[in-house]
Structures are given as C-alpha cells and as structure tokens.
Amino acid sequence: SEPGLALLFLIGALTLGAYQAVFNMVPYRFSAAPYLFPTWIVSGFFLVNAFGSLAASVSGNLVARYGRRRVMPFAALLTLIGLVLTIFETLWIVIPALIVFAIGFFAVHATASGWVTARAVAGVGAAGQAASAYSISYYLGGSSFGTLGGIAWYHWGWSGLVTLTATLISLVVIFALLLRRIPPLQKSGY
C-alpha cells in the first residue's frame, strides 16, 4: 500500500527482466552472423558484468553523497543509453555499450534494494517483508521478461529485443522520476 515501495518493486522486476533478456540472448547474437564467434569468445562477453559488480559498490558511495532520489534516475538512464547503443554491430561500440548497460543495471538494483529496506524501516516497519517482496518481484520480472526477450529475439532479432528491453528500462526511468515526487518518510528522508 506504500507507493514508494510499489514503485521500487516494479523497478526491480523491470530492470532484472531487461538485464536477463539481454544477457540470455548475448550468446545467440555473437555466435550468429556477422560475428560467428566461437563459444569461448562469446563466453568472454559475460566479463562485462565485472564492471557492473564494481558499479554496485560505487553506487552506494554516490547514494551516500547525492541521495537515492538523484542516483536512481541517473543509473536508469545510464542503463537505457547502454542498451540502445547495443543496436550497432560495430564491436568497439557494442562492448562498451554492454559495459554501460551492466553498470547501470547493477547501480539501479543496488540503489533500489537498499531503498526498499530503508523505506520499509522508516514507514511500515517491516523491512524483512519488504525485502522479500522486492526479491519476489525482482525474480518474477527476471524470469518473465527474460522469457519474453527470447521470444522477441526469435521473431525480430536483436532490434526486437532492444525494443522490448528499452521499453522496460524507459518505464524504470519514469518510475525513478516518480519516486522523486513521492514525499520522503519523516523518520529517514527516504
């Protein structure tokens, strides 16, 4: 019933959904024409997630300095920019784009999951339940939209996948901006 938590649950679902959809299809994209990379090279594309892991800790520092209300929309927009740039076929654009996408995703998730707990403690006082609800929505979104990403890839290729996932991340950007308009809870400022 708390609107801030509801938006955070949706952000988690949509963000992981887009992330899983993209990285589920990365092997198919890079093993097909024009790349035709062997499996051992395609597997290397998952190393971009190391940058995302670093981004999670950096986003914590950014949240401490600038606040969740500023970091979340920026991270969501970064995710969207990285995603859209993957539409190109040139590797020197696609690889950095996947890195930016991963960085944005991990920053959104780290910010959202921390915000859920802080908002729940300050508001309804049920941090465990809120964290569980976030996890459920996060993984439901990942499995549902990850599957839809495969369908989009099958019918429309990478451009169809990018269209689907860009729609999801655009909603995340909108929801992150809406979170800025929801008044902070008095006890914590979240």
Where are the regions a protein language model picked out?
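Pair of pore-lining "gating" transmembrane helices in MFS-fold secondary transporters
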Residues: E2-A21, I99-I103
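Multi-pass alpha-helical transporter architecture, strongest
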Residues: L164-Y190
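Helix-to-loop junctions at the C-terminal end of transmembrane segments
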Residues: L54-R68, W153
